[in-house]
Design a protein with these regions (language model features):
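Long beta-strand-rich cores associated with HINT superfamily self-processing modules
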Residues: 83, 96-205
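Charged, alpha-helix-enriched surfaces in structured cytosolic catalytic cores
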Residues: 24, 28, 61, 65, ...
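An acidic, glycine-/histidine-flanked metal-binding catalytic module
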Residues: 2-30, 34-43, 155-250
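Active-site acidic/histidine clusters and adjacent loop/turn architecture
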Residues: 20-81, 88
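Short, charged low-complexity intrinsically disordered segments located at boundaries
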Residues: 60-70, 96-101, 135-142, 203-204, ...
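Terminal, regulation- and interaction-focused segments at domain boundaries
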Residues: 89-96
Length: 250
């Protein structure tokens, strides 16, 4: 009896190792993607003086959640089937200030040579019937372990603060009503989604106007400091103002 138990345990050990590697590969994929995103954040902060990424969250689905999805989709209960059939085990959500930031970040990630774009769904240009908006991408990235190279799917969701607030509230309401939301609440959520879109557009318009003013101010400051042969000269207003007036009037 003891010998049989030991044999069973020995047989289970390779399976346990594979299960551990399987789940860890998704954690490693998140680590890789988070590194890429953090590099972009640092570059924007220090080089471009603007960071389009407000914050980032991530998660790996629990084995229980994976099992429920397998049963719902009718997939075989095997690691190979899970890997190919379920592409959102590893997930990252990027929250941006403005809608234009969403597409800029998406393009920057897609241009990276080790990232393969599997699928892209634009729920901003084509919102879901309930009003949900977000940009979804399924990416595949290489993960290098001690004895193998694996290619892992990661789901990326990119949305604005307003879109995220709406989605978070809708999610809570959805489960509060046990997935049966009254029509009146659905209509109000749809109106709120439209308001969120209008808010995003308004805030982006203000942001662009502020940037234009800032650029003009910077140009003004730059005019007052001339660099000639590595020697810096200050241009006084009494000299600069009539020169500018004559230039713009000509």
């Amino acid at each position: 009896m003891v010998a049989q138990t030991l044999d069973n345990l020995k047989q289970m050990k390779p399976l346990k190792t594979e299960l551990m590697r399987f789940m860890m590969s998704y954690k490693f994929a998140l680590d890789e993607m988070n590194t890429k995103i953090n590099i972009l954040k640092q570059e924007f902060k220090y080089i471009h003086d603007y960071n389009p990424i407000e914050h980032v969250t991530h998660r790996v689905k629990s084995p229980e959640s994976i099992l429920k999805k397998i049963q719902r989709k009718g997939y075989d209960l095997s690691l190979a089937s899970i890997k190919e059939g379920i592409t959102d085990i590893a997930g990252i959500r990027i929250i941006c200030s403005f809608t234009s930031d969403i597409y800029e970040i998406s393009n920057m990630l897609q241009r990276q040579k080790d990232i393969k774009v599997i699928k892209c769904k634009d729920y901003i240009k084509n919102p879901k019937p309930n009003g949900y908006q977000s940009l979804h991408m399924i990416l595949q990235i290489p993960i290098f372990m001690s004895d193998r190279e694996d290619h892992v799917y990661v789901e990326i969701q990119i949305r604005t603060i307003a879109m995220d607030f709406w989605a978070s509230l809708e999610h809570k309401i959805y489960y509060k009503y046990n997935k049966e939301i009254p029509q009146k609440i659905k209509d109000e959520l749809k109106e709120a989604a439209i308001s969120a879109t209008q808010l995003d557009k308004k805030m982006e318009k203000i942001h662009k106007e502020v940037n234009e003013i800032k650029e003009l101010d910077n140009d003004e400051e730059n005019l007052q400091e001339l660099l000639i042969n590595n020697e810096r000269f200050h241009v006084p207003d009494d000299f600069l103002i009539p020169i500018k007036r004559a230039y713009y009037d000509s």
